[in-house]
């Protein structure tokens, strides 16, 4: 098992650039879960993670890469699509007793893919009813499929929540390495940050308490050298693709890569 997770750590870091500490925290937690999975029954998902940090630093990519490397199906649910009062129906479905009843996107996916990764992207944008559904998954590991009227089990799922909450931490230049910020400080920032539109906290206290008992990872800012490396890798892939399709041979002056960083 140890060798498996060492290889997983290496392969994920090759794809998710500049986030070694966050990757390490996630891998260690998954390793611990696998070691302890035979010690008794547990409620809730197999593992859950809250990834916090600035936009565009690889939070969603980290979750996606974990699923690809573990070779399990995954689904990414953008919570901005679940910001209205009745949007939760898209997740759990509507009763087939009514005309137009249909199965929910989330429960259908988990019913068909018991071992899977679920990414709730930008969780702070979710409507309150959606948050309550997520609480039920975290606490009980089940969700009622409104269409089939049967419970769907989430016990073998790995759940990632991503969030851009925590601006007081990642906008503070004194915090050089975000991934080293102690968990209690991160939790306090999550609990106290308010939605500028409603002037209410982004997260209800109930979900904060539940997330605090799980795995919380602060994801680091993207350093200039890492950004440059990502740009170079993407350009190499693009050039290779053009060469295979059209036979083009392209050479780029190294200084040109730096220009892309400011576009």
Predicted regions and their residues:
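AAA+ P-loop NTPase nucleotide-binding core of proteostasis motors
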Residues: 1-263
């Amino acid at each position: 098992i140890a060798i498996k997770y060492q290889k997983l750590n290496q392969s994920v870091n090759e794809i998710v650039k500049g986030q070694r500490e966050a990757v390490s925290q996630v891998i260690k937690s998954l390793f611990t879960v696998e070691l302890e999975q035979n010690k008794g029954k547990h409620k809730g998902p197999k593992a859950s993670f809250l990834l916090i940090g600035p936009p565009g630093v690889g939070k969603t990519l980290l979750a996606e890469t974990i699923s690809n490397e573990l070779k399990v199906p995954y689904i990414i649910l953008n919570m901005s699509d679940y910001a209205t009062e009745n949007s939760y129906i898209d997740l759990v479905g509507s009763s087939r007793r009514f005309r137009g009843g249909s199965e929910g996107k989330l429960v259908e996916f988990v019913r068909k893919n018991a071992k899977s990764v679920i990414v709730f992207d930008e969780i702070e944008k979710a409507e309150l009813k959606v948050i309550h559904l997520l609480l039920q998954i975290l606490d009980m590991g089940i969700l009622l499929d409104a269409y089939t009227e049967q419970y769907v089990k989430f016990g073998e799922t790995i759940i990632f929540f991503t969030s851009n909450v925590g601006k007081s931490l990642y906008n503070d230049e004194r915090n050089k390495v975000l991934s080293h910020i102690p968990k209690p400080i991160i939790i306090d920032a999550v609990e106290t940050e308010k939605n500028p539109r409603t002037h209410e906290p982004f997260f209800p206290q109930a979900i904060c308490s539940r997330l605090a008992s799980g795995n919380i990872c602060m994801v680091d800012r993207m350093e200039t050298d890492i950004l440059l490396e990502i740009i170079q890798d993407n350009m190499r892939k693009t050039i290779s693709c053009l060469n295979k399709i059209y036979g083009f041979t392209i050479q780029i002056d190294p200084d040109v890569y730096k220009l892309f960083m400011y576009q």
